[in-house]
């Protein structure tokens, strides 16, 4: 079985192998991001049942009246910045650099506030 992982692949044993053995794996930096006017999502890992992405918020909170309500749990880590997540029910959760939390499946939530420099890691998975 082969699975794509950001320019590499796993092979039966689960070992990571370069697609071209003459070339080393490509190293990328999580903190490299372009400032912009919109929130950007960069996939880092995409496996069956598991997706890891970088989110650069660029100060973009959820649109007025918009709520996330996802069928699978999501674990989020605020790598840099500050944010306020609003849960329905549950109220607000204030986050700062280094804070993480697990959002259970089917939990209505939104980003009420996020700083312009905010960078997240979001892990979506099937339980």
Specify the residue positions occupied by each region the protein language model found.
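A short, N-terminal "cap"/entry segment at the start of jelly-roll beta-barrel domains
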Residues: 15-67
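Short, conserved beta-strand element in jelly-roll/cupin
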Residues: 69-84
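Ligand-binding loop in jelly-roll beta-barrel domains
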Residues: 105-127
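Acidic, Ala/Val/Gly-enriched low-complexity intrinsically disordered segments
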Residues: 2-4, 8-11, 22
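Short acidic-glycine-tyrosine-enriched beta hairpin
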Residues: 90-105
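General beta-strand recognition
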Residues: 51, 84-86, 110, 119
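A generic "binding-loop/recognition-motif" signal
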Residues: 48, 71, 91, 107, ...
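Short histidine-centered beta-strand/loop micro-motifs
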Residues: 42-44, 63-70, 86-87, 93-94, ...
